[in-house]
Amino acid sequence: NRVNPDDLPFFYALLKHLHDAGCKVPQFITDRDGQWLQTVAGRPACLIEFLDGVSVTEPTAVQAYSTGAALGHMHKALANFTLARPNSLGVSAWRPLALRCTADGLESIAAGLSERVFAECDYLEAHWPSNLPVAAIHADLFPDNVLMLGDHVGGLIDFYFACTEIRAYDLAVTHSAWCFSNDGTVFDTDVSAGLLAGYTDIMPLDAATQAALPILLRGACLRFLLTRCYDWINTPANALVTRKDPLAFLRRLDFYSGPSEVENLFRHRA
């Protein structure tokens, strides 16, 4: 339901490009005539290849290293990918999304949350980098979108938030998703070091990107905080869908907002 049918050719081309470059991603399955897009019950439909592996809930530093390297290889492969898709959940979308949540809705989740969210929107809009490399990114590489075979990555899946964005923002999203306990209360320095080492062994970060990383990390947290807030406010309590705790990403945001925390990320690298 969340996929715009007009975006399907972008996703198809993206996955084919990555597959042809040797990245472990699923492929669209074609019919005898070579067509990958069908119509079922009046709606667009396609079949996606199955990949072996399991998603981990408590990743190890070694698994994080493998994931960082896989993300780096994906970014390297996408350097010459020419199609583009706007990021509908980028920095320009966060304030409108916060307004749709309403101040009362945000306050129903936690006292003071509305003021915190809009202050963060102000800060990020004023400081969002404009001089970093832009490319196609995954934008949602949580542990449940990485299939592990032991300590090795068996596949990267669920590219339906893929878009054109600052490349390092993808690393920020992945870091915020992988390096904390599920509730955001515990930061794992070993997993962080592994993830960053795996990525930078493939895609080294220049000084400008390292300097911008604190902003990108905060942006990643605000994005998921807001989408979780919106779902929390607008999903009935008796719905079959399980709502995800927005405050897990507020805690991450608070962590990354610490003045020395991001410098420590690189200090703790293996």
Please report, for each region that a protein language model flagged, where it lies by residue.
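Active-site acidic catalytic loop and adjacent metal/ATP-binding pocket
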Residues: 28-30, 122-169
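A cross-family kinase active-site recognition segment
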Residues: 58-112, 134, 240-241
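ATP-binding pocket architecture of kinase catalytic cores
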Residues: 1-83
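Active-site activation/catalytic loop segments of kinase-like enzymes and analogous catalytic loops
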Residues: 168-204, 219-236
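ATP/Mg2+ or Mg2+-diphosphate-binding catalytic cores
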Residues: 100, 224-270
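Anionic ligand-binding catalytic core segments
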Residues: 152, 167, 181-186, 248, ...
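All-alpha amphipathic helical-bundle segments outside canonical DNA-binding/catalytic cores
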Residues: 207-217
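Structured catalytic core of nucleotide-sugar glycosyltransferases
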Residues: 15-16, 21, 25-38, 42, ...
